[in-house]
Structure formats: C-alpha cells, structure tokens
Amino acid sequence: MGSEMWYKRQTLDSANTIADGTAVKRVGDRIFEYAKKNIDQMLTVEDDELVGAFLDMVENHKMIVENSGLLTVAALKQLDLKGKKAVAILSGGNMDVITMSSIVQHGLIQRDRIFSASVLLPDKPGQLALVAQTIADAQGNVIKLEHNQFVSTNRNAAVELRITMEAYGTEHKNQIMKALEEKGFRPREIGAKLY
C-alpha cells in the first residue's frame, strides 16, 4: 500500500481470511497511531501466500506457526532480500488439527505435489492395471481412484477413471501426464479433492 494509506484509517466490509487472529475490519486507535509512527512500509498478504508459508515452515523448519503468526514470513517472500539479513517474528501455534490438515493439503495442491486427472478407458480387463503401471513407471503415487462406469450411455464404450496422485512438483506432474498421454489415455487435469 502507498504511504497515503497511513494517514486515513480504512474500514473494510469484511475481514475474511485464514489469518483469523489478525482479521479486523478496522484497526484500533492506539495500534493505528503506533503503526503510523513506526512502520515504514505495509504489504498485503493473500491467503494462498500464507498456505505456502505454512507448508514451508512445517516441511523445512519442522515448526507449526498459526496463520496470523506467518504474516511476516509470507510478506518477506515478496521482498528482494537476497544477500541481506532479515528477521521474521513468528508467533502462535494455536491451530487445530483439522485446520492444519486442510492447509497442508491446499499447499500440496498449490505446488502440484497432489493433483487429479480424469481418463476415459475402454471397459475391458487390464485397463486399470495399465494406468496404474504407467503412473508407477513415471514415479507417481496413486492416492485415490474413482471408477465411474456410468459416464457414457454405452458403458461398454468407455468408463471414466479419476485419479488423485502425488508428484514432486509441476515438472514431475507434467511428466506423469505425458506418460499417460503416450499410452493413449488422453488425461485431463481436474481439480484435486482429497475428501
């Protein structure tokens, strides 16, 4: 935000964010005056950036920090700090297990480490095994399969297979999709859902 924002308090219509510990529609009088005097720059952070920061902290630092406490980490990623020293203040670990699980899953999906694809298969023996082997040969890992025989009015013509898989990232995901394509499965990426 520009410096002009410091001189007028804003009131938001809503404060809907996963950083619920800092979600306010209007900053308090004392905090606003303190911030105006002491803060040089203000950055905004999207929920997707917080999800990425949470996943980084869990995977790389083995720390659980609540979303509001990760605002500094997510904001620092927006700045060019290469070769500079910076300190991010981390606070809070007040997060329930369901929320943690949801954030980790969203982070893995964001980074293409979990993705889903749909393929149409001839309804004949061995097709499911061939798909599974193709994914395994590409070093992918199947998490979930949904086999739908009723996608076509002529179920003997084709069945739909929805596959949720693990990959190492975008490049690996693309390799798995290419391997399926090369076997003639014509995969189509669909939104990943783990539940």
Predicted regions and their residues:
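Alpha-helix capping/termination and helix-coil
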Residues: R26, V58-H61, D80, N94, ...
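A generic structural signal for well-ordered coil/turn residues at beta-strand boundaries
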Residues: I18, N38, E59, N67, ...
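Active-site-adjacent helical/loop segments in soluble small-molecule enzymes
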Residues: G28-K84
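A conserved regulatory-domain signal marking ACT and ACT-like small-molecule sensing domains
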Residues: V97-Y195
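Glycine-rich beta-alpha junction loops
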Residues: I18, T22, R26, E46-L50, ...
